[in-house]
A protein has these predicted regions:
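Catalytic glycan-binding domains that act on GlcNAc-containing polysaccharides
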Residues: 8-199
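Boundary at the C-terminal end of the N-terminal hydrophobic targeting segment
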Residues: 2-7
Length: 199
């Protein structure tokens, strides 16, 4: 079996030799997922998932401040809370880290938005590989993947079989649908990526 880490290299978010802009730093009260559109496209394409899916998940996860200092305070107040611009929990991150041989640690998610986006794209790739092609028609594949990102793979598979999502999952799904057009606009504004028109 091939080493999964060899197939999905980490995008070089701070490389300037190819004309790409650096990943913008996080500022207190100034987080906008659209600022990371270039990083989203690179990470999603490296992982083989839809940039629109990744960007919409980032918009859904933008409900709390993501400045590294604020994340440290949040972690002190609520141990076990998720980290990074994509709000990844430690257990999920450790699964992704082991599978892809990532050298960074979970705490690095809070200080490195590009790494957090890369880890989120890899997790969405894993969810996509485990989601059957046939599933209930009332939920799109991207909606099921977003629910899997939020509620876990086991719940995603249950929703795919037709189990109705509970109140928290329904709330996440409503926000995901509402953020879809904003995510598409962010991607289109960053260079007109083809997935932006498919939402």
């Amino acid at each position: 079996m091939a080493d999964p880490s060899a197939a999905v290299p980490r995008p070089q978010s701070d490389a300037l030799d190819d004309g790409e802009a650096r990943t913008p730093p996080l500022r207190p009260g100034g987080y906008d997922p659209a600022q990371y559109a270039g990083c989203v496209v690179r990470s999603a394409e490296a992982a083989g998932v839809s940039p629109l899916l990744v960007m919409t998940v980032l918009h859904n996860e933008a409900y709390k401040p993501h400045h590294p200092l604020l994340e440290r305070l949040w972690q002190w107040w609520k141990p076990g809370a998720s980290f990074g611009v994509a709000n990844m929990h430690r257990v999920t991150f450790e699964q992704v880290r082991r599978r892809y041989g990532l050298s960074q640690r979970w705490h690095d998610l809070r200080d490195d938005p590009a790494f957090a986006i890369h880890a989120a794209a890899l997790h969405l790739k894993d969810l996509d590989q485990n989601l059957p092609e046939r599933h209930v028609r009332r939920l799109s594949r991207d909606e099921l993947l977003a629910l899997g990102y939020n509620a876990g793979e086991r719940n995603m598979l249950a929703f795919a079989r037709g189990v109705p999502p509970g109140p928290m999952a329904r709330s996440y799904l409503r926000r995901f649908r509402a953020h879809r057009s904003r995510a598409a606009t962010a991607l289109a504004s960053s260079g007109g990526h083809r997935d932006a028109a498919e939402g």
